[in-house]
Amino acid sequence: MTRKYFGTDGVRGRVGEAPITPDFVMRLGHAAGKVLAHGAKTGQGKPTVLIGKDTRISGYMLEAALEAGFTSAGVHVLLTGPLPTPGIAYLTRALRLSAGVVISASHNPYYDNGIKFFSADGDKLPDAVEAEIEAAIEEPMVCAPSDDLGRARRINDAPGRYIEFCKSTFPHEQDLYGLKLVVDCAHGAAYHIAPHVFHELGADVVSIGNQPDGRNINDGYGATAPAKLVEAVKAHGADLGLAFDGDADRLQVVDADGRLYNGDELLYLIVRDRQAAGQAVPGAVGTLMTNMAVELALKRQGVEFVRAKVGDRYVLEELNKRSWTLGGEGSGHLLCLDRHSTGDGIVSALQVLAALRRSGKTLAQLLEGVRLFPQTLINVRVQKGFDWQSHAGLQAARAAVEPELEGRGRVLIRASGTEPVVRVMVEAEQAEMAERAARRLADALGA
């Protein structure tokens, strides 16, 4: 399906530039409201949507625009204020609402923002519904009669409800007493949520990245910038550090020695913990970028591994297709569908902590069987529109390289979606093997 406005994770861009302008966002809210009203069942009354946001200064402006759009279409609005993206998904489902909307650009800088929708079930909107909304945006915006306008009000207990939900995903027989955690909230939506979750379960919590000012979200803190977390873990003598991104749907973990663990390793850890608890795990889903060492380690444990396109949306699609529950990507998007309908950094952290408590081991001990393969990435500049798949020299080089790597590495070649570059990535057991193979492939492209 060709999309004009919706990307793989909603509508996103630079604030003040199309499409992230107040007038467009109001039209977007109105269009989504019309689609929801049209699909509402007879006798259910007006649809109601939940709107949450992260801590970007532009969130106030875009929240007001969305509110105007929805209410002008005859849709009621509930406002949560700053709340993690997965919190909006949870509350949308728990409150039996028509849809949820998040104003966030996730891990991007503060000057970007975006709009993401959740269905009544707390899932990403189906493509067909997004297509309906895009079509409705192009129609004239007609305000509902005064008697049919929607109302807007704030939910004052949204953070508390979500905190209790997060805690409910942690085993009731376990607690976090005696554990010292550093929690990095990226000056984002989890700043007033995550520390409370872990503290209420018994942990001694040191918070960093928890003073948002509207412009410092993701700036030197959080899952995409873990250096300060590593420093804080060592400085405070903490057992573990947890880093979330701006909307708290990603997780990175640091151990007491300052070693960083990414989403690939954490996915393996959670799968193994489910198995240790006696739960059958027939398969797990990663992406094209998931480290091969994780795939091989899972297969040794009898777990089938499937690769989706990059993006948690596609991981979720593959999980649903197979009725599996566990998936994720190296960036820290982890899906535990037996706990939540969407990726949730706080819930994922609780699954990691549950594994540590259940086993009595450290992260390093639990992940002894997974040594990530070294990766070599070479970006080769090409002419715009270049078709690397038809390049005879590259295909010949690939045909020679892949048999040498079989069972010990892999090749991934893909075109960049944003610049005239072909990305050549090789993973192998040994760094020298990966570098040699990647250079051979890049040279075949004329690098």
From Swiss-Prot:
It catalyses: alpha-D-glucosamine 1-phosphate = D-glucosamine 6-phosphate. The modification Phosphoserine is found at residue 106. Its cofactor is Mg(2+). Disulfide bonds: none annotated. Mg(2+) binds at residues 106, 245, 247, 249. Coiled coil: none annotated. The active site is at 106 (phosphoserine intermediate). Keywords: Isomerase, Magnesium, Metal-binding, Phosphoprotein. InterPro entries: A-D-PHexomutase_a/b/a-I, A-D-PHexomutase_a/b/a-I/II/III, A-D-PHexomutase_a/b/a-II, A-D-PHexomutase_a/b/a-III, A-D-PHexomutase_C, A-D-PHexomutase_C_sf, A-D-PHexomutase_CS, Alpha-D-phosphohexomutase_SF. One of its GO terms (molecular function) is magnesium ion binding. GO terms for cellular component: cytosol. PROSITE patterns: PGM_PMM (PS00710). The keyword Isomerase applies. Its EC number is 5.4.2.10. It comes from the Bacteria. Activated by phosphorylation. Catalyzes the conversion of glucosamine-6-phosphate to glucosamine-1-phosphate. This is Phosphoglucosamine mutase. It comes from Cupriavidus necator (strain ATCC 17699 / DSM 428 / KCTC 22496 / NCIMB 10442 / H16 / Stanier 337) (Ralstonia eutropha).
